[in-house]
A protein has these predicted regions:
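Short loop/turn motifs that connect adjacent beta-strands in outer-membrane beta-barrel proteins
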Residues: 36-44, 144-151, 200-202, 232-233
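Residues on the lipid-exposed face of transmembrane beta-strands in outer-membrane beta-barrel proteins
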Residues: 48, 88-94, 137-141, 156-158, ...
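Extracellular/periplasm-exposed beta-strand and loop segments of Gram-negative cell-envelope proteins
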Residues: 56-83, 103-134, 161-186, 213-214, ...
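Transmembrane beta-strand segments that form the barrel wall of outer-membrane beta-barrel proteins
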Residues: 203-217
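Bacterial N-terminal signal peptides that target proteins for export
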Residues: 1-10
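Transmembrane beta-barrel architecture of outer membranes
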Residues: 186-192, 217-225, 235-237, 261-267
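Bacterial N-terminal signal peptides
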Residues: 9-18
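Short glycine/proline- and aromatic-enriched beta-strand/turn motifs that initiate or cap beta-hairpins
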Residues: 22-102, 265, 269-273
Length: 274
């Protein structure tokens, strides 16, 4: 009996000594990974873009009892009469809201000599200038559809127009230098969509469209562009834009103003954001 008890004691001691070694060979349970809180939205993002838009212009216009006359100006022809422009946009957005303003200022001009000897203005020089301003302001809410790298907003706003035409005549007759001017201003409400799609850290796509108007006016535009982020703050974009305008103002039988136009062509922009 003494030997049997001694043998069992040795077996038990050996088992206790071997248990840690066996346990060290078993796979150990990993410690739970630290849960990292998702990054919160960075708040408002602001963008300022300066751009140049090379446009073709077509449409028709008329004043008073005279019939409307069609017109078409290619980009080359517009550049021949180009006297200056300024174009830019400002946009502020976050995960819920968007707001912005777009400004287009342009001036065209040209002159000619009246060489028809039967004209009462024979020998005069006529100089025509056209100044146009188009300002669009909008705001909107994000539409929660699509992948997380798509920001799609429904927008409402207004687009204001200013047209100023001046005709200056220089006559060989002393003291005779008449000037004729026509100025028209109007504002149209608009509604549409604005989208910003992030392809990756470098590339992105922008799209914007809207349409609106009142009883005697209408306007609409579509814009698409591809952009490249050179740094976290600086990007460049290239794209295509089309803008439609229609306006009629009747202030009397001799003051019937009619204007309809399409402006369309490529553009390139430089954007700074923060």
């Amino acid at each position: 009996m003494g030997m049997r008890k001694y043998s069992w004691a040795l077996i038990l001691a050996a088992a206790l000594c071997a248990a840690p070694a066996v346990a060290s060979d078993l796979p150990t349970k990993k410690a739970p990974e630290e849960i990292v809180a998702p990054a919160l939205p960075s708040g408002w993002q602001f963008e300022i873009t300066g751009y140049g838009w090379g446009t073709w212009l077509s449409g028709q216009a008329g004043v008073g009892p005279f019939p409307s006359s069609p017109f078409y100006l290619s980009l080359v022809k517009l550049l021949e009469h180009f006297q200056g422009s300024a174009m830019g946009a400002f946009v502020a957005r976050n995960d819920t809201f968007i707001g912005g303003v777009d400004v287009i200022l342009a001036r065209l001009g040209g002159g000619t000599n009246v060489e028809d000897p039967t004209s009462a203005l024979y020998g005069s020089h006529a100089n025509l200038t056209l100044t146009e301003a188009i300002v669009t302001a909008f705001g909107g809410l994000r539409i929660p559809i699509g992948p997380p790298n798509l920001q799609l907003y429904g927008t409402v706003g207004a687009r204001g127009f200013h047209l100023h035409t001046a005709l200056d005549l220089t006559s060989p007759v002393p003291g005779f230098a008449p000037t004729f001017t026509l100025t028209k201003d109007w504002v149209d409400p608009v509604a549409g969509l604005a989208a910003h799609y992030i392809v990756n850290e470098k590339w992105f796509v922008n799209f914007l469209t809207d349409f609106g108007g009142l009883d005697n006016s209408a306007t609409g535009q579509a814009l698409g562009s591809v952009g490249y982020n050179w740094t976290s703050s600086i990007a460049t974009t290239v794209g295509f834009r089309a803008l439609y305008t229609y306006e009629r103002q009747v202030d009397g039988p001799l003051r019937d103003f009619r204007y309809q136009s399409w402006m369309y062509g490529p553009f390139a922009g430089f954007k700074y954001s923060w």
